[in-house]
Swiss-Prot record:
Belongs to the pseudouridine synthase TruB family. Type 1 subfamily. It catalyses: uridine(55) in tRNA = pseudouridine(55) in tRNA. Responsible for synthesis of pseudouridine from uracil-55 in the psi GC loop of transfer RNAs. Keywords: Isomerase, tRNA processing. The gene is truB. NCBIfam families: TruB. This is tRNA pseudouridine synthase B. The lineage of its organism: Bacteria, Bacillati, Bacillota, Bacilli, Lactobacillales. One of its GO terms (biological process) is tRNA pseudouridine synthesis. It is an enzyme of class 5 (isomerase).
C-alpha cells in the first residue's frame, strides 16, 4: 500500500473529484482523498492524502488557505466569477484610487459573515445550491462566519477603455471562505458591480504552489518508478499543535489509554521521535487517543 501526502497542482477545467479519480488509476490505489475542494476554474494547491494518510485528511481540510487572484470592477456575473453570464453593469465610481481600495479591503479583516453564492456546493434542504440555480429556482441561503487574516492589493489599478478596473489581490482565510463572494462584497463596498476574474490557491495545509506537482509530472515520475512526490504523513498534521511523547506514553497510547499532558489544546499531534503516532483529543483534563496511526 502507498501511504503519504501529495502536493497536487490542480489545473483549470478539472474538478477536485476528477483529480482524485485520476490519481487512483495512476497509483492503483483506491484509498485516496483530497483536503479541500477547489472549483473547476481555480488552479493551485490541492492536498491529496493516500493510504493511511487519509486518516488525517480532515485536519488538512480544516487548515487555513492562501489565495491569489484578480478582481474586475464594472460588472457582475451569475457565478461571481469569470465563467458566469453578465447580470449587471455599472460605471466606475467618480473617485477610485488605490488608497480607497486599500482602505476598503481592510474593513474585511477579522471575522466576517458571508452568504454563499448560488453556484456553490452548499446544501439547503438536501440539494446543492447550484442545482437550484441551474433550475432557475431561488432559495434562502444560510450565512456563515469566516475569518480573513490577510486581504491586500498586489498590483496597481488597471483601468481599461471599456470602463473596467482590474487589480490583483492576495487573501489568507479560514476554511469555508468564498473568495468569489469576497470580490463581490468588495465591489459592493466600493459602490460598483464586480466579480472575481481569476483565482489560484497558493498555499493550503502548509503546502505551497512552488513545490506542487501537476498530474502530468506525477504520471511521468510514476512511469520511472520515482515516488519522491509522495510526502510523509506528518505533512497532514502540520497545522496541529505538536506534543513529543516518551516510550512509556507511546505504550499507553497503543493500548488506547488516556494521558495527562502539559497542554490545554483541544487536539494534539503526538510524535515519537520524528513520526506522528496519534491524534489526541482533550477529555476531562486528560488526552484520549482519537486516532492511533501506528
Amino acid at each position: 500500500m502507498i501511504n503519504g501526502i501529495i502536493n497536487l497542482k490542480k489545473e483549470a477545467g478539472m474538478t477536485s473529484h476528477d483529480a482524485v479519480f485520476k490519481l487512483r488509476k495512476l497509483l492503483q490505489e483506491k484509498k485516496i482523498g483530497h483536503g479541500g475542494t477547489l472549483d473547476p476554474d481555480v488552479v493551485g494547491v490541492l492536498p491529496i492524502a493516500v493510504g493511511k494518510a487519509t486518516r488525517v485528511i480532515e485536519y488538512m481540510t480544516e487548515a487555513g488557505k492562501v489565495y491569489e487572484g484578480q478582481v474586475t470592477l464594472g460588472y457582475s456575473t451569475t457565478t461571481e466569477d469569470a465563467s458566469g453570464e453578465v447580470v449587471a453593469r455599472s460605471s466606475l465610481p467618480a473617485v477610485l484610487t488605490e488608497e480607497l481600495v486599500d482602505q476598503t479591503m481592510t474593513t474585511f479583516l477579522g471575522k466576517i459573515t458571508q452568504t454563499p453564492p448560488m453556484y456553490s456546493a452548499v446544501k439547503v434542504n438536501g440539494r446543492k445550491l447550484y442545482e437550484y440555480a441551474r433550475a432557475g429556482e431561488s432559495v434562502e441561503r444560510p450565512r456563515r462566519e469566516v475569518t480573513i487574516s490577510q486581504f491586500e492589493r498586489t498590483s496597481p489599478l488597471n483601468f481599461t477603455e471599456d470602463d473596467l478596473c482590474r487589480f490583483s489581490f492576495k487573501v489568507a482565510c479560514s476554511k469555508g471562505t468564498y473568495v468569489r463572494t469576497l470580490a463581490v462584497d468588495l465591489g459592493r463596498a466600493l459602490g460598483v458591480e464586480s466579480h472575481m476574474s481569476f483565482l489560484q490557491r497558493s498555499a493550503s495545509a502548509g503546502l505551497t504552489l512552488e513545490t506542487a506537482y501537476t498530474l502530468g509530472e506525477i504520471a511521468d515520475m510514476v512511469s520511472k518508478q520515482e515516488m519522491s512526490f509522495l510526502l510523509p504523513i506528518e505533512y497532514g498534521v502540520a497545522d496541529l499543535p505538536k506534543m513529543v511523547i516518551d516510550d512509556t506514553e507511546l505504550t499507553e497510547i497503543s493500548f488506547g489509554r488516556r494521558l495527562s499532558l502539559p497542554s490545554q489544546e483541544p487536539l494534539l499531534a503526538a510524535f515519537h521521535g520524528e513520526k506522528v503516532i496519534a491524534i489526541l483529543e482533550k477529555r476531562d483534563q486528560e488526552y484520549k487517543p482519537k486516532k492511533v496511526l501506528i
